[in-house]
């Protein structure tokens, strides 16, 4: 099964799980950021959670600009995973605990994502480590789920360290080991920094990057 097929299958299972358990779509706090995923009338001034569902991108996006900027060949799965859908983070249960798959909420969020992946790849170069790029986090908030760029294998990675535990030889095989986790919408803590005024998991990624940068300076 391809990465895009595995992701689409998980998304369908995710929506079905919410319908079976709650007879509704999942909810999410967009924090004033519009998205094609929002499945109701949207008020940018409202602080309430909204019903949402993943939306397939037409046409799909790509990371050609990232590859060109860094003069690197990116594994094809980065496009299949990140550029096929707009979506809020997808909560999951797994053999390694609870976690979230990171996806872009909107085109603006996709651009933030690309900037963060560039930053991650540059930091790996600075640390003289093999290139990886992240696709999620585990619930402890201290570990990323990353993809080894050269092979496409999925690993657990602590910011600033070399990945030590391989979870699956590919994203597709990793996703097949996940099950949807039904959870109430959790309102993210707002921060003052205007560069981080987009919703979802990125504020957690910011804290992880602070830790990574601190370690690299030691």
From Swiss-Prot:
Disulfide bonds: none annotated. It is a peripheral membrane protein. Keywords: Cell inner membrane, Cell membrane, Membrane. Its main location: membrane. It is found in: Cell inner membrane. GO terms for cellular component: cytoplasmic side of plasma membrane. The keyword Cell membrane applies. InterPro entries: Syd, Syd_sf. NCBIfam families: PRK04968.1. Belongs to the Syd family. This is Protein Syd.
